[in-house]
Amino acid sequence: MEKEILLEVNHLSKKFGDQTILKDISLTLRKSEVIVIIGPSGCGKSTFLRCLNGLESVSGGDIILEGQKISDGSMPHAELCQKIGMVFQSYDLFPHMTVMENITLAPLQVQHRNKEEVFKEAIKMLSRIGLSDKENAYPRELSGGQKQRIAMIRALIMKPDIMLFDEVTASLDPEMVREVLDVVMELAKEGMTMVIVSHEMQFARAVADRILFFDKGLIAEEGTPDAIFDNPQNPRTKQFLHSFTYEN
């Protein structure tokens, strides 16, 4: 039995002035499904994620979340961000706040949850990712990998239905990439519904239920990880994947 559809995208388009960034994008995302989007820089991957959680308006088409159309702006953005969480490649932690203050700000001020319960949950989540000793640290005292894991917790503590990850390892040193990807992999095992933009091909293959290859604002090809990586049908997909291997 197929799981319920959480998100539907129907013929989505996005323009900036005369430039078309996304062209006729359609997909469905089911509960606990992990979709990984791959593709060259500038093909619309990040813009697509920003459309999903309302950071960018759409030029055409519909986005439907749990049966409710959200692409028309009818859902308040604060409410939408509680349902669809997002982690960016640039961390975006508040530099003047401690780790604990960064994590607990939104659930306390936006969701008006019980302070004691929120702090207890934050401590538990910090312990889970091995950063329980950093609750009183400031962002400047953390490594890039630690900042990114804190950014993930800050989004997850809002209890979103869907998580979006936009190239979360792009600005990290190679040694820090694994510690961040391990957290995402663990979320997948626990059934978190996710859409992930990534250039980490081995990770994409391991974590995804479905791979989408974006090119020039279109879904040029989609399929299971095995289908995309072992037997791509689109010549452009083959060319892109070949760029990740070096043959002398």
Regions found by a protein language model. Name each.
Residues E222, D226-N248:
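C-terminal boundary and immediately downstream tail of ABC-type ATPase nucleotide-binding domains
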